[in-house]
Amino acid sequence: AWWEQKGGNGAILNLIGTGESNDAYICEIPPGKSLKPERHIYEEMIFVLQGSGATTVWVEGSKKQTFEWQEGSLFAPPLNTWHELHNGRSNEPARFLAVTCAPLAMNLYHNLDFIFNNPFVFSDRYQATSDYFSGSGKIHSGRIWETNFIADVYGLEPPERTERGRGNREFLFELVDNTMAAHISEFAVGRYKKAHRHGPGGHVIILS
């Protein structure tokens, strides 16, 4: 359905089991168009499902930065930065899935103007350096990747993590100093990940 705030089609996903700790949504950018610019006091992580395009990011008083993405890209607009997503193709829509902690912010503040129209700049989260969205970063403990942009998760080869099961591989992602994180796991044919449990909010996406 049309989502006026976004300027594109979208659907909100509020899964049972998230405990209102986070939510998700799917959004579609019309061919050759852009979504409306927005900023917000909650974290957001975006995974591109279809198409290619670009995102422009900025804060008050800084130069705008634009980086390109494609199907399989993973990134996060830094907290409360202005960001605008563009569809780079004129003949088909671009679609992405986003996970956010909007429910926490909305339940805590009960004020949409504070959440969506707050001028505070988190300079510790976003420094507008030229290489901010270059895809570079640091790898900690062999499997924790601290970065701000992943061009193609399908092309990654995660390191082995046999303590989770024989043939298991895993990469953990820390994006733009968010408290929300993500990881990708790979299992060999006929293998499985050892049983485990954790708190609410996990969104599982099957890549292949």
How should these model regions be labeled?
Residues 1-20, 112-184:
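A short, N-terminal "cap"/entry segment at the start of jelly-roll beta-barrel domains
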Residues 3, 14-17, 36-37, 73, ...:
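Beta-strand elements of modular eukaryotic interaction domains
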Residues 34, 39-71, 81, 197-198, ...:
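A short beta-strand-loop-beta hairpin characteristic of the jelly-roll/cupin
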